[in-house]
Regions:
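Alpha/beta-hydrolase active-site loop
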Residues: 2-44
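N-terminal start-of-chain detector that recognizes signal peptides
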Residues: 3, 50-53, 136-140
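Conserved aromatic-histidine-acidic binding/catalytic patches
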Residues: 18-25, 47-55, 169-176
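Primarily recognizes the serine-hydrolase "nucleophile elbow" in alpha/beta-hydrolase
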Residues: 36-101
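Serine-hydrolase catalytic core
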Residues: 103-195
Length: 195
């Protein structure tokens, strides 16, 4: 059958043997860059007090919110357009281990145009798995540390100087549910964040 497409899976292997840690290391990289810039020339020579504004769309907005969760005192403003604020639904597939369950449903992305008769499902290399007996198990603790929308964590975050938030999100967003962002904003306001 000339129209047949073989369904197969490929994992991306980064050149430095890294893995998709989904947010934590990227947020730490951003924060380390902010701390370095604030402590070194030419910004230090300017008398300090330079505002730190993080902005992003989708995953970039997620990283901005995650930076504010990790080090709220270091960020003055968050400008977020359509980020996700929790690992809702099957978004765990982006961490890479969804392929263990069913690579045709829980993949990072796919390509069905590169080859005529091959449908490629693609995932990142991952450190994590869904085996509860493994030291690499993606536990609830490892999940919630990556979620800006966690009320317990937001309560702790509210005890520190924290950023002002400007958040945009379409009610028609099919990738990241508007209701999640609405809940995030509600909790931020409840805890007296400036939104």
């Amino acid at each position: 059958n000339q129209n047949y497409k073989l369904r197969t899976h490929v994992s991306f292997l980064p050149s430095k043997n890294e893995y998709q840690n989904f947010g934590i290391m990227q947020a730490m990289d951003i924060l380390n860059a902010i701390f370095y810039i604030k402590e070194n020339s030419p910004f230090k020579l300017m008398g300090g007090g330079i505002r730190t504004i993080l902005f992003g769309n989708s995953y970039g907005g997620y990283l901005a919110n995650l930076c504010a969760k990790i080090a709220p005192w270091s960020i003055d403003f968050i400008l977020d357009n359509s980020s996700f604020v929790n690992l809702f639904g099957n978004i765990f597939r982006l961490i890479g281990f969804g392929k263990e369950i069913d690579f045709t449903r829980y993949h990072g992305t796919y390509d069905d145009t590169l080859f005529k008769n091959i449908f490629l499902y693609l995932s990142d290399k991952t450190y994590w798995n869904n085996n509860k007996f493994s030291k690499k198990y993606f536990s609830n603790a490892r999940k919630i540390i990556r979620e800006p929308l966690n009320k317990e964590h937001l309560i702790i975050q509210s005890l520190y100087p924290n950023p002002k938030y400007i958040l945009y999100h379409s009610i028609f967003d099919e990738r990241s549910p508007f209701e999640n962002k609405e809940n995030f904003v509600h909790i931020l306001k409840e805890l007296n964040f400036k939104v």
